[in-house]
Amino acid sequence: MANSAQAKKRARQNVKARKHNASLRSMVRTYIKRTLSAIAGGDYAVATEAYKKAVPVIDRMADKGIIHKNKAARHKSRLNAQVKALAN
């Protein structure tokens, strides 16, 4: 348990940061799910639009360290491959 005032403050800040980071991670997952559901719908235009909205969010969270940069790259690559497969 935190004893010093500094340690208590850091504990409070960590709780706040954890909640904020969880919210941001949830947002990334939501954008990915929206893109996947658009792909499942089979409409190339809708899937492309969803992908274009998801990519900047994924990149921003990777830059902030919310998700690892390799994980962001993996998601973008797989989503892009699925969207391109709809074009054929």
From Swiss-Prot:
Pfam families xref list: Ribosomal_S20p (PF01649)
Biased composition (Basic residues): 7-21
Entry's Gene Ontology cellular component terms: cytosol; small ribosomal subunit
GO biological process terms on file: translation
Region (Disordered): 1-21
Sample GO molecular function, one term: structural constituent of ribosome
Gene3D superfamilies noted in UniProt: Ribosomal protein S20 (1.20.58.110)
Domain of life: Bacteria
Keywords: Ribonucleoprotein, Ribosomal protein, RNA-binding, rRNA-binding
Role summary: Binds directly to 16S ribosomal RNA.
Similarity section: Belongs to the bacterial ribosomal protein bS20 family.
Name of the protein: Small ribosomal subunit protein bS20
Species per Swiss-Prot/TrEMBL record: Acinetobacter baumannii (strain AB0057)
Highest classification ranks of the organism: Bacteria, Pseudomonadati, Pseudomonadota, Gammaproteobacteria, Moraxellales
Gene label: rpsT
